[in-house]
């Protein structure tokens, strides 16, 4: 019997969500269909599956387009962060990704999660720094941060 998996199943007749697979009739009736792990692969259900896949692909494409637009916006702006300094322009502590995210939100009304910024040690000196940002699995951008004396 041909079934469409509605969720991931591990074990004898394993399959991933959305996968169409031929399984024994008893296994399908007594386990997969009974526990709602799968539905029978009727022409209507197959068509519905195709529509779901198409919709998911369009949503993913839209996410990528949004990330590319945000990358373009970030490349044209500069974030100014002020920090306390000592002699010779050395900062007391460092400028963290949290401070950069807050400044970006306050100055340009752009919200980016601090965990998406790749700045393991923070910024330790005055001046300009380019901070890489992972906007999407496929799209990376850069935030230009200007650290000034407070």
Swiss-Prot record:
Q: Does the keyword rRNA-binding apply?
A: yes
Under the cellular component aspect of Gene Ontology, which terms does the record hold?
A: cytosolic large ribosomal subunit
Per the UniProt record, the source organism is Staphylococcus aureus (strain NCTC 8325 / PS 47)
Per the record, the similarity remark reads:
Belongs to the bacterial ribosomal protein bL9 family.
Q: Which PROSITE patterns match?
A: RIBOSOMAL_L9
Q: InterPro entries attached here?
A: Ribosomal_bL9, Ribosomal_bL9/RNase_H1_N, Ribosomal_bL9_bac/chp, Ribosomal_bL9_C, Ribosomal_bL9_C_sf, Ribosomal_bL9_N, Ribosomal_bL9_N_sf
Key words of the record? Ribonucleoprotein, Ribosomal protein, RNA-binding, rRNA-binding
Q: What's this protein's name? A: Large ribosomal subunit protein bL9
A Pfam match is Ribosomal_L9_C
SUPFAM superfamilies in UniProt: L9 N-domain-like, Ribosomal protein L9 C-domain
One GO biological process from the UniProt record?
translation
Q: Does the keyword Thylakoid apply?
A: no
Any idea which GO molecular function terms this record carries? rRNA binding; structural constituent of ribosome
Described function: Binds to the 23S rRNA.
